[in-house]
Amino acid sequence: KDAIIKAVYQGAGVSAKNLIPPTMWGYNDDVQDYTYDPEKAKALLKEAGLEKGFSIDLWAMPVQRPYNPNARRMAEMIQADWAKVGVQAKIVTYEWGEYLKRAKDGEHQTVMMGWTGDNGDPDNFFATLFSCAASEQGSNYSKWCYKPFEDLIQPARATDDHNKRVDLYKQAQVVMHDQAPALIIAHSTVFEPVRKEVKGYVVDPLGKHHFENVSIE
């Protein structure tokens, strides 16, 4: 992950261990990230009867996004790491609209995606990206539908008790870590250059641009 952050994000990102970024409420810092251990990976493949490795598709986005500035480069780095343990990845891409359509239809084996939050609420990540409902033509590209996870995120979105929501989302992050429906690689740091004569512009945490209080001097 550190190598990817350096090469793909030019250092403008942090290694991820949870779906939501560490700046969002409900973040569970007690979750331990997976260690980089190729020998253990080989042992697990052998245990699964795949000692000689296997081939798999790795879909890479054809566009540059705030959460992934160079998906092709990231895919190549993942491909190289997988090759070290005997997994041969074929990088696949399509035009962006076709990519999204095919991914929603579940045509991929593994697919690279990302997310920019819409409202600052953990539900916008957990339910939007990994709920059972979202696995059916939604944004749950992993197609993962897991009842113990669902039993945490659905009550969390239904209550207005903030402390209860925090507790439920922290538990949900543990479940995601243990089940691993996706490997969360990085949380990007987004920069917005502003000329010195522009006054009153504030960077929006949700990626929007507000100009009502902006002036030029």
What are the residue ranges of the model-derived segments?
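Flexible loop/turn segments at secondary-structure boundaries
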Residues: 15, 27, 64-67, 98-100, ...
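Periplasmic binding protein-like
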Residues: 58, 80-134, 168
